[in-house]
UniProtKB/Swiss-Prot annotation:
Entry's family note: Belongs to the asfivirus H339R family.
Keyword annotations of the record: Host cytoplasm, Host nucleus, Host-virus interaction, Late protein, Virion
UniProt induction comment: Expressed in the late phase of the viral replicative cycle.
Keyword Cytoplasm tagged: no
Principal location listed in the UniProt entry: host cell
A GO-annotated cellular component: host cell cytoplasm
Subcellular location: Host cytoplasm; Host nucleus; Virion
The UniProt record lists the keyword Chaperone: no
Subunit description: Interacts with NACA (alpha chain of nascent polypeptide-associated complex).
Signal peptide span: none
Protein name, UniProt field: Protein H339R
């Protein structure tokens, strides 16, 4: 049954590519025009939401713990800080929206009102790029430098490392784990509890980081669009068989390197062209023995796109022009390397 579904999906993409500009399809799958793949993005969002909740809950547990009775000033500051985090969480993550349409953890998005889906789409990137999520990611980056010690609950980082401060939360140096851990007022149980809190804080922050790093798209759909578009275009461009074969045979690079491409995409401010740029670059680097003849064929394909742009510039996405320029640039670099 699964195989049939994939075949139908491929047939649908083949049909769609015939009727749509391939870069517009690329935009739709990436989500850079406001469209998002709910079956991919919704589970990702839930993971982010849960990990953010776990992060704040861990700080809340510490604030209410008996060990903090020994640090009244720190406790009060932490209490106020946690209140601010919960307020931010309520603002960004507490909308029920799609949750109420879940049945046993699954959502049939065809049954969700369009207005609900549109609202989620509008708020999705605002939420995952919020100050709250950014704070947790920065906290994760700081703690990741001590990854092995924290995951092993090794107090070395709080006892032996230089400095008087170990504050894993940006802009909140009042939460100093070295100060808490090394107090003479603590029992051994208190010390173990403090290390456990640091461990839970880090694993929750890692959960946010890992969820954020999940691509918003189905890579297989993107592969199918590339293959289907090549299949359509090569019928219109004769004597470029070798170059088209190279593109088709190199689609595995997209899947292999996609996490890197996606990180670059996010870092570029969600510019989808960066994915294609990096993909073309990797095809070039993976083709050290590419001949001048194949290089010429690549340029013929690029010329085809340039001609399309010249005749349909008002209706075609301007990103196509950028893509063509990037491909030409990579081919020029390849030619220089061979000369």
């Amino acid at each position: 049954m699964a195989g049939r579904v994939k075949i139908k999906q491929k047939e649908l993409i083949d049909s769609t590519v015939k009727n749509k500009n391939v870069m517009n399809l690329f935009h739709e799958i990436i989500g850079s025009k406001g469209n998002i793949n709910f079956s991919v993005v919704w589970p990702k969002f839930k993971k982010i939401k849960q990990s953010v909740y776990d992060y704040i809950s861990t700080l809340s547990v510490l604030e209410k713990a008996s060990v903090m009775q020994n640090f009244e000033a720190d406790k009060k500051l932490l209490e106020l800080f946690v209140q601010k985090l919960w307020a931010a969480y309520e603002g960004y993550f507490k909308y029920p929206e799609i949750e109420k349409y879940e049945v046993e953890g699954q959502v049939n998005f065809n049954l969700v009102p369009q207005c609900v889906l549109e609202k989620f789409s509008q708020l999705y990137r605002i939420r995952i790029n919020s100050e709250l999520v950014t704070l947790i990611l920065n906290s994760c980056a700081f703690m990741s430098k001590y990854n092995d010690y924290i995951l092993k609950k090794d107090p070395y980082i709080l006892t032996i490392t230089p400095g008087l401060c170990f504050s894993p939360i940006p802009n909140f140096e009042d939460l100093n784990f070295k100060h808490l851990y090394n107090s003479d007022k603590n029992s051994q149980h208190d010390k173990e509890f403090i290390m456990f809190i640091l461990y839970k804080l880090y694993t929750a922050a890692l959960g946010v980081y890992n969820a954020i790093s999940i691509p918003d798209i189905d890579v297989e759909d993107l592969e199918n669009i590339i293959l289907s578009s090549v299949s359509q275009i090569k019928k219109q461009i004769p004597r470029c068989k070798d170059a088209f074969n190279k593109i088709e045979s190199s689609v595995h690079l997209l899947r292999k390197n996609f996490n890197t491409y996606y990180s670059d995409y996010v870092g570029s401010g969600y510019n989808p062209t960066i994915i294609m740029e990096q993909y073309i670059k990797d095809i070039s680097q993976d083709s050290k023995n590419i001949s001048p003849r194949i290089s010429y064929q690549f340029r013929t394909i690029i010329k085809y796109y340039r001609d399309m742009i010249a005749t349909r510039h008002q209706t075609m996405d301007p990103q196509v022009l950028n893509l063509v320029k990037h491909v030409e640039k990579k081919l020029d670099m390849l030619d220089r390397e061979k000369n």
